[in-house]
């Protein structure tokens, strides 16, 4: 199988190339915090020589509770993204939830993301594809890895072949997720070699059946990330926060920002080791 390479500016995203860190915060809480988080990621990735794309949401439209914080909204969020790009020279990835958001968001950010809960919505998929932007497709928790090929086909039929796939865990009964390590290879095959990345922090989610917000297992973020990197993937999708216990969204799954450098050191070492091995054909 031939691995496809998707370019985000001068960054190559491919399963056989050095991993790309798609990292940032879950939702934009403030301009100042976004600057703080992005600055730390840039400092660490520049020091370690890891390709980097900043991630955050301007609107968490799928929060469980009507009372939960959603974000600053598209207009203010795009202003923050523009400032981050100007200040730090970073590429940016952000999700869209409505068709009307696709074009204005694609004019500012470098990658638009299709949320897991919306990945089967054909009208939204087509609108995103027609922007011509790089698209990151989150695998729905309820969808098998092999079905991701159908979503890729929808995008490609619109003339856009710049597709990245992202695993963020699979339903394991009610209110829990598990990561199928075999699924990464299945997605590569189903998509004919699209880059596959791993959203480790969202894969740590779990919840109280009657609760209004997701819980998480951030104490296990390193071990789960190590396992995903060992498969040989194009990138890691990570959320970090200066104070996870007081984050406005998904704090229980977020890596403490102070632990970022040590974490990335380990991920880079695993990625380099795995990709130094010759490919073995064990299918015969």
Curated annotation (Swiss-Prot):
Source organism, top-level taxon: Bacteria
Matches recorded under Pfam families: DAHP_synth_1
Broadest EC class assigned to this enzyme: transferase
Protein location: Cytoplasm
MF-aspect GO terms: 3-deoxy-8-phosphooctulonate synthase activity
GO CC terms of this entry: cytoplasm
GO biological process, one term: keto-3-deoxy-D-manno-octulosonic acid biosynthetic process
EC number: 2.5.1.55
PANTHER family, alphabetized: PHOSPHO-2-DEHYDRO-3-DEOXYHEPTONATE ALDOLASE
Protein name listed in UniProt: 2-dehydro-3-deoxyphosphooctonate aldolase
Gene that produces this protein: kdsA
């Amino acid at each position: 199988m031939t691995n496809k390479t998707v370019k985000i500016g001068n960054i190559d995203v491919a399963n056989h190339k050095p991993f790309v860190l798609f990292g940032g915060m879950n939702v934009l809480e403030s301009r100042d915090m976004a600057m703080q988080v992005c600055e730390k990621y840039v400092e660490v990735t520049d020091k370690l020589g890891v390709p980097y794309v900043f991630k955050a949401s301007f609107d968490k439209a799928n929060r469980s509770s009507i009372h939960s914080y959603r974000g600053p909204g598209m207009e203010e969020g795009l202003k923050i993204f523009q400032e981050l790009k100007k200040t730090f020279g970073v590429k940016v990835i952000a999700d869209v939830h409505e068709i009307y958001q696709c074009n204005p968001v694609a004019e500012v950010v470098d990658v638009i993301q299709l949320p897991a809960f919306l990945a089967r919505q054909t009208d939204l998929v087509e609108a995103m594809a027609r922007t011509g932007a790089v698209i990151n497709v989150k695998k729905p928790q309820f969808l098998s890895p092999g079905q991701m090929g159908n979503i890729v086909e929808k995008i490609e039929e619109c003339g856009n072949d710049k597709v990245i796939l992202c695993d963020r865990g699979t339903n394991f009964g009610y209110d829990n997720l598990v990561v199928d390590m075999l699924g990464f290879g299945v997605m590569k095959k189903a998509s004919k070699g699209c880059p596959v990345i791993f959203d480790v922090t969202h894969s740590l989610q779990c919840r109280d059946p009657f609760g209004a917000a997701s819980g998480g297992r951030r104490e296990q973020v390193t071990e789960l990330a190590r396992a995903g990197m060992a498969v040989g993937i194009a990138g890691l999708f990570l959320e970090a926060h200066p104070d996870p216990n007081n984050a406005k969204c998904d704090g229980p799954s977020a890596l403490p920002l102070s632990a970022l450098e040590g974490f990335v050191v380990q991920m880079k070492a695993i990625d380099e080791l795995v990709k130094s091995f010759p490919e073995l054909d064990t299918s015969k």
